[in-house]
Amino acid sequence: MAKISKRMKSVKGLVDKQKVYALDEAIKLAKETSTTKFDSTVELSFNLNIDPRKADQQIRGALVLPAGTGKTQKVLVLTNTKVKEAQDAGADFVGGEELITKIQKENWFEFDVIVATPEMMAKLGAIGKVLGPKGLMPNPKTGTVTMDVAKAIDEIKKGKIEFRADKEGNIHTIIGKASFTAEQLKENFTTILNEMKRVKPQTVKGDYIINITISTTMGPGIKVEIN
């Protein structure tokens, strides 16, 4: 069993696992319990009262975090029709079938997000089994299958994130870095919470959000009040 460092033990003692914290206190604790030497990611988990087996309760979407993510996203645009627009908008890689082949044959993944124009989707099917598990398959619901590649690139570079409920009804996402100010983290948290409420399936009965947990990379989970 891996040894728990003195620092890890001390920060775990700061968090009462049974307590549900007000947002301001939860964010303060998350920053205080960041134990990594690098700038930890601040993560958010929603446990939702949904049944993802039902088509009308499969939650998926995307939004731009107002304070950004703290990470520079590399964008690959797959297109035959919007090459210049993609290049002018600041895409890191732009191409067509030759880049699909590169992914397929060379296991090339030097990018974080794929944006594709509609005519490329049939060709992308050849590597769907590779992209799917990595969460890289473009999808109209998240705005990554589009003719407006400039808008898609701009949003991603500004801090767009995607979210999707897993088979247990949980959504895992991020709200920034431990180096962010408390106000930046609060602003991003509120934006995500409002979006979660907006996409609530109409068929859900009773409480929709069961609990929310905030944590940093390798840090303890902190339960947050739902308002």
UniProtKB/Swiss-Prot annotation:
Binds directly to 23S rRNA. The L1 stalk is quite mobile in the ribosome, and is involved in E site tRNA release. Protein L1 is also a translational repressor protein, it controls the translation of the L11 operon by binding to its mRNA. GO terms for molecular function: rRNA binding; structural constituent of ribosome; tRNA binding. Part of the 50S ribosomal subunit. Belongs to the universal ribosomal protein uL1 family. The lineage of its organism: Bacteria, Bacillati, Mycoplasmatota, Mollicutes, Entomoplasmatales. Gene3D superfamilies: 3.30.190.20, 3.40.50.790. GO terms for biological process: regulation of translation; translation. It comes from Mesoplasma florum (strain ATCC 33453 / NBRC 100688 / NCTC 11704 / L1). This is Large ribosomal subunit protein uL1. Disulfide bonds: none annotated. One of its GO terms (cellular component) is large ribosomal subunit. Keywords: Repressor, Ribonucleoprotein, Ribosomal protein, RNA-binding, rRNA-binding, Translation regulation, tRNA-binding. The gene is rplA. It holds the Pfam family Ribosomal_L1. SUPFAM superfamilies: Ribosomal protein L1 (SSF56808).
